[in-house]
């Protein structure tokens, strides 16, 4: 480049330049650190200028083009002699490397506008004059208005005699603004511009107007809003001191020794006091004064000086103590102890002998308001009368062993035989086994389960003899054998229907007799005239017995009774011609919930036209073993109806929340003195009722942890046994003997707990039945098995 361009004027630095500061050779240049290092931004220059405190401002162009020309302008008369080495080192830099760096700088600054202009100084050299910095939002410079008054804190009164009021940032005078006339002020007050305040700015002398930001701030303050944007007044509270009480030591320092070692200083002080007492300098007891000294001239007599202590009389009885005061004797008793106006009036009108207490409780509020007790002298006088006039008697305490008050029960070993172990397990049902029944001969066992099948097993061996599927969807809820050995008829309830079947596994003679009993009803049903149109239109007409389908008929099913509602209970009459069914569903009408079926006539009757009052829907029903009485149990009570007279005989109140089942003693009203029955409930209680004693239970037994599903007496009365089945997976065997003596009660003894069924789906043992001649019982469980207990 030519010398004219290279002769740029720079102001010299007032301090010496270090020799090695910022000088690198071309070989030492590391291109990895050049990212962002070359820049011609004015902000970089301004930051460098601010950091220098002891330097004269350098006004220069730091572009790559000027850096290339700096070598020629560093004369020896402009900078200290130490800078010559710096110029030499710069001249040793390779021209190619420096030119490449300058080319990169020029290319990077071509698209940006220069922030300076070149002028001539007094010597004719180029002078670079930079534009004024316009700070942005991120700059540290404050935005100063163009005509702002920069006089600072000088009062404006100093400029009253001058035509100007101050100076701007460039040092120019700010002239005093012209004042308007009164008409102009009136017009300004009428046409109020935006931001008008009516005040005068003391720094400029012009009317003070508010900016848009200030108006917005005033609006937020007036509307009770948050002035600052982005401020959240509902930030979560930082609990510097937590509100929860922390019970812990503030430090983990060990306990100091002075806490558990006697103090030496206190020991010294105590020893000083002890030494002073021994020397007589400190008297532990205050000597009596002259006033306290006794007067020897006064003669004193002791009335009991010669009185010898007399022993109590052998029959001496100490005086009884007064009872401690109660809440009603307090001067501020609780409100429930204060009498009402009615009680107070009744107490005042009653005779003193008839009053429950001799005073009325009063509330005085505080102890200082309590007056004197008017009956105090009277009570003390009566107390004295009681002490020396009333005879005293010693009461001897009865030393009775509580065990002797309990009835002596016989040992279970003396009450054998009863079932104690599992002998046979019956497996074959899919799902829960809901019901079972042992036939009158004691050879066969019928079961029904959730799979909709009825199975007949050989009792002793557990071999399945016969099976029929009655329903594809509904379970078999109950199966019962017809009483009597002359025929073998099985009744089963599955879904809405009752099925009567004769299993083809018995002798031909018994099978023929059973079929004859069932076929006799078809002839009677055919002879009955058809119902009239009025009777046919009734809602709850008795169902007609039907013949089964061909597939069921081939398997031994002989008749079907469509009840239209699900039956959960079925019980036969002792003669085998009647059986009663109960539909306990809540949607079942009350008039059809209980039905009595006649086997010889194929006839179904509904004895109840209305719902039984109290206790909810019916749950179970049984015939009396020797009387024409029907027992019907709902959720809370058991009612006995005389079928011959059609009257309600008795209502039993077991006190259970929900009755699950009940059974009548087989020898009721024959060998025993009255009727006895047992009741099982879902609230884990087993209740024994003696109808001759009371409507309430005679005994309540609570031995199970879960609901009781079934209870059963041993049939025939040969063995005084009964059992219950519970959801806890166990059976309880009891001894229950009754006698014909009206003065003696039933004897109930718990004998054995039988466990073997698994609890499945919160259900355990669902049904239980006894062998007709042996002390054996059979149980059905929710685990899909049946067990024979011997």
UniProtKB/Swiss-Prot annotation:
It comes from the Eukaryota. GO terms for biological process: maturation of 5.8S rRNA from tricistronic rRNA transcript (SSU-rRNA, 5.8S rRNA, LSU-rRNA); maturation of LSU-rRNA from tricistronic rRNA transcript (SSU-rRNA, 5.8S rRNA, LSU-rRNA). It is found in: Nucleus, Nucleolus; Nucleus, Nucleoplasm. GO terms for cellular component: nucleoplasm; PeBoW complex; preribosome, large subunit precursor. One of its GO terms (molecular function) is large ribosomal subunit rRNA binding. InterPro entries: BOP1/Erb1 (IPR028598), BOP1_N_dom (IPR012953), WD40/YVTN_repeat-like_dom_sf (IPR015943), WD40_repeat_CS (IPR019775), WD40_repeat_dom_sf (IPR036322), WD40_rpt (IPR001680). Residues 46-84, 133-143 have a biased composition (Acidic residues). PROSITE patterns: WD_REPEATS_1, WD_REPEATS_2, WD_REPEATS_REGION. WD repeats lie at residues 428-467, 471-511, 613-651, 654-699, 703-744, 760-790. Keywords: Nucleus, Repeat, Ribosome biogenesis, rRNA processing, WD repeat. Residues 1-12 have a biased composition (Basic residues). Residues 1-143, 321-346 are annotated as: Disordered. Residues 117-130 have a biased composition (Basic and acidic residues). Residues 321-337 have a biased composition (Pro residues). SMART domains: BOP1NT, WD40. Component of the NOP7 complex, composed of erb1, nop7 and ytm1. The complex is held together by erb1, which interacts with nop7 via its N-terminal domain and with ytm1 via a high-affinity interaction between the seven-bladed beta-propeller domains of the 2 proteins. The NOP7 complex associates with the 66S pre-ribosome. Component of the NOP7 complex, which is required for maturation of the 25S and 5.8S ribosomal RNAs and formation of the 60S ribosome. Belongs to the WD repeat BOP1/ERB1 family. This is Ribosome biogenesis protein erb1. The gene is erb1.
């Amino acid at each position: 480049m030519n010398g004219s361009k290279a002769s740029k004027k720079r102001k010299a630095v007032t301090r010496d330049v270090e020799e090695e500061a910022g000088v690198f050779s071309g070989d030492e240049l590391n291109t990895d650190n050049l990212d962002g290092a070359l820049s011609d931004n004015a902000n970089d220059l301004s930051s460098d200028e601010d950091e220098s405190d002891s330097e004269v401002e350098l006004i220069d162009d730091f572009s790559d083009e000027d850096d290339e020309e700096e070598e020629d302008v560093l004369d020896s008369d402009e900078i200290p002699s130490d800078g010559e080495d710096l110029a030499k080192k710069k001249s040793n830099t390779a021209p190619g490397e420096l030119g490449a760096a300058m080319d990169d700088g020029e290319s990077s600054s071509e698209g940006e506008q220069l922030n300076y202009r070149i002028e001539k100084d007094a010597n004719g050299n180029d002078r670079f004059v930079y534009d004024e910095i316009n700070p942005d939002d991120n700059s540290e410079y404050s935005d100063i208005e163009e005509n702002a008054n920069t006089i600072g804190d000088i009062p404006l009164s100093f400029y009253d005699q001058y035509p100007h009021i101050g100076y701007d940032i460039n040092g120019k005078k700010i002239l005093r603004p012209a004042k308007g006339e009164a008409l102009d002020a009136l017009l300004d007050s009428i046409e109020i511009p935006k931001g008008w305040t009516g005040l005068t700015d003391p720094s400029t002398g012009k009317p003070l107007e508010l900016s848009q930001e200030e108006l917005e701030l005033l609006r937020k303050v007036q509307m009770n809003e948050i002035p600052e944007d982005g401020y959240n007044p509902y930030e979560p509270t930082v609990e510097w001191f937590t509100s929860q009480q922390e019970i812990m030591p503030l430090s983990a320092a060990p306990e100091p020794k002075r806490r558990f070692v006697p103090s030496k200083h206190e020991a010294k002080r105590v020893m000083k006091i002890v030494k002073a007492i021994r020397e007589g300098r400190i008297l532990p007891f205050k000597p009596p004064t002259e006033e306290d000294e006794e007067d020897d001239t006064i003669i004193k007599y002791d009335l009991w000086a010669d009185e010898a202590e007399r022993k109590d009389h052998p029959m001496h009885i100490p005086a009884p103590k007064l009872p401690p005061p109660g809440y009603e004797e307090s001067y501020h008793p609780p409100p429930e102890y204060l009498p009402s106006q009615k009680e107070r009036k009744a107490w005042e009108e009653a005779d003193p002998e008839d009053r429950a207490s001799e005073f009325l409780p009063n509330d005085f509020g505080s102890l200082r308001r309590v007056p004197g007790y008017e009956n105090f002298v009277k009570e003390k006088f009566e107390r004295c009368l009681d002490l020396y006039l009333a005879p005293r008697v010693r009461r001897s305490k009865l030393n009775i062993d509580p065990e002797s008050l309990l009835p002596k029960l016989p040992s279970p070993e003396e009450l054998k035989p009863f079932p104690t172990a599992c002998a046979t397990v019956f497996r074959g049902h899919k799902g829960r086994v809901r019901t079972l029944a042992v036939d009158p001969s004691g050879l066969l066992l019928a079961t029904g389960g959730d799979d909709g099948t009825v199975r007949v097993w050989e009792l002793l061996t557990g071999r399945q003899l016969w099976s029929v599927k009655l329903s594809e969807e509904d379970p078999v809820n109950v199966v019962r054998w017809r009483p009597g050995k002359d025929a073998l008829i099985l009744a089963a309830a599955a879904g809405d229907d009752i099925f009567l079947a004769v299993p083809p596994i018995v002798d031909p003679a018994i099978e023929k007799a059973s079929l004859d009993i069932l076929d006799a009803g078809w002839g009677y049903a055919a002879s009955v005239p058809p119902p009239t149109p009025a009777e046919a239109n009734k809602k709850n007409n008795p169902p007609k017995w039907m013949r089964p389908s061909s597939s069921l008929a081939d398997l031994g099913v002989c008749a079907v009774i469509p009840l239209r509602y699900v039956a959960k209970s079925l019980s036969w009459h002792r003669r085998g011609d009647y059986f009663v069914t109960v539909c306990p569903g809540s949607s079942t009408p009350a008039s059809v919930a209980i039905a009595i079926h006649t086997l010889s006539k194929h006839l179904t009757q509904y004895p109840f036209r209305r719902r039984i009052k109290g206790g909810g829907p019916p749950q179970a029903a049984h015939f009396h073993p020797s009387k024409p009485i029907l027992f019907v149990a709902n959720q809370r009570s058991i009612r006995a109806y005389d079928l011959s007279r059609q009257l309600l005989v008795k209502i039993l109140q077991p006190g259970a929340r929900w009755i699950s089942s009940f059974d009548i003693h087989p020898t009721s009203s024959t060998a025993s003195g009255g009727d006895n029955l047992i009741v099982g409930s879902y609230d884990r209680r087993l209740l024994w009722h003696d109808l001759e004693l009371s409507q309430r239970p005679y005994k309540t037994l609570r031995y199970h942890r879960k609901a009781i599903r079934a209870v059963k007496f041993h049939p025939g009365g040969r063995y005084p046994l009964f059992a219950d089945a519970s959801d806890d997976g166990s059976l309880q065997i009891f001894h229950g003997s009754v006698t014909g003596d009206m003065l003696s009660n039933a004897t109930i003894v718990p004998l054995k707990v039988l466990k073997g069924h698994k609890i499945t789906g919160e259900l355990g043992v669902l049904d239980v039945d006894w062998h007709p001649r042996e002390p054996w019982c059979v149980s059905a469980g929710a685990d899909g098995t049946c067990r024979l207990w011997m």
